[in-house]
C-alpha cells in the first residue's frame, strides 16, 4: 500500500482551513480531567466566534465538577475528510447576561429542553483558546493557528 498523497498546506491559509473544518465538523469532542483520569465526550456548541467556542451544559453532568476543579480543556474537531482542529484553552462560566440572552434566543433546542434562561441547571461555558492547531488528513503534522 502506498503512502497517501497530502497536498502541501500554505501557512497563510491555515486559519481559514481551520475555521472551515470547525464549520464542517460541527460536533467536537471535549476533553476534561476527572482527577488523574481524562474524560472525553461529544458536545454541541451553541455559539462559535472564530476559535472561541460556547458550550451549553447541565449542572448535574460530570463535566461540571471536572471543569470546576480544572478548567483546562481541549476541543477536537474532525471533519468527514479527517482534517482536525484542536483548540486548547480554558473553560469559563459565561455570566454576560446580554450574550446569554442572545445565545438563548438563537437556540430553540435550549428553549425546548430548559424552558427558561434562568433555569438553574443551565451553564454556558466559553472556551477561550490559548492554542489552536490544524492538521490536514494524513499529513501527520499540526500547523499552529495564529491567535
Predicted features, each with a name:
Residues 11-16, 57-60, 108-110:
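Charged, amphipathic alpha-helical segments
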Residues 27-55:
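N-terminal leader/targeting helix
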Residues 1-10, 84-147:
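Charged, gly/pro-rich active-site loop segments
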Residues 29, 52-54, 74, 86, ...:
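General beta-strand recognition
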Residues 1-28:
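Extreme N-terminal tail/first-helix region
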Residues 25, 70, 107:
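Acidic-histidine catalytic/liganding microenvironments
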Residues 46-82:
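A short mixed-secondary-structure module that forms the rim of ligand-binding clefts
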Residues 20-34, 73-77:
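A short, Trp-centered hydrophobic/proline-enriched beta-strand micro-motif
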Amino acid at each position: 500500500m502506498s503512502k497517501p498523497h497530502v497536498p502541501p498546506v500554505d501557512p497563510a491559509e491555515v486559519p481559514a482551513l481551520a475555521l472551515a473544518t470547525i464549520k464542517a465538523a460541527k460536533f467536537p469532542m471535549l476533553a476534561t480531567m476527572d482527577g488523574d483520569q481524562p474524560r472525553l465526550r461529544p458536545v454541541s456548541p451553541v455559539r462559535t466566534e472564530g476559535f472561541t467556542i460556547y458550550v451549553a451544559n447541565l449542572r448535574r453532568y460530570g463535566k461540571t465538577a471536572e471543569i470546576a476543579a480544572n478548567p483546562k480543556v481541549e476541543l477536537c474537531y474532525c471533519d468527514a475528510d479527517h482534517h482536525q482542529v484542536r483548540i486548547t484553552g480554558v473553560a469559563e462560566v459565561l455570566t454576560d447576561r446580554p450574550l446569554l440572552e442572545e445565545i438563548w434566543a438563537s437556540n430553540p433546542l435550549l428553549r425546548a429542553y430548559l424552558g427558561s434562561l434562568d433555569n438553574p441547571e443551565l451553564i454556558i461555558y466559553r472556551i477561550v483558546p490559548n492554542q489552536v492547531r490544524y492538521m490536514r488528513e494524513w499529513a501527520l503534522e499540526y500547523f499552529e493557528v495564529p491567535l
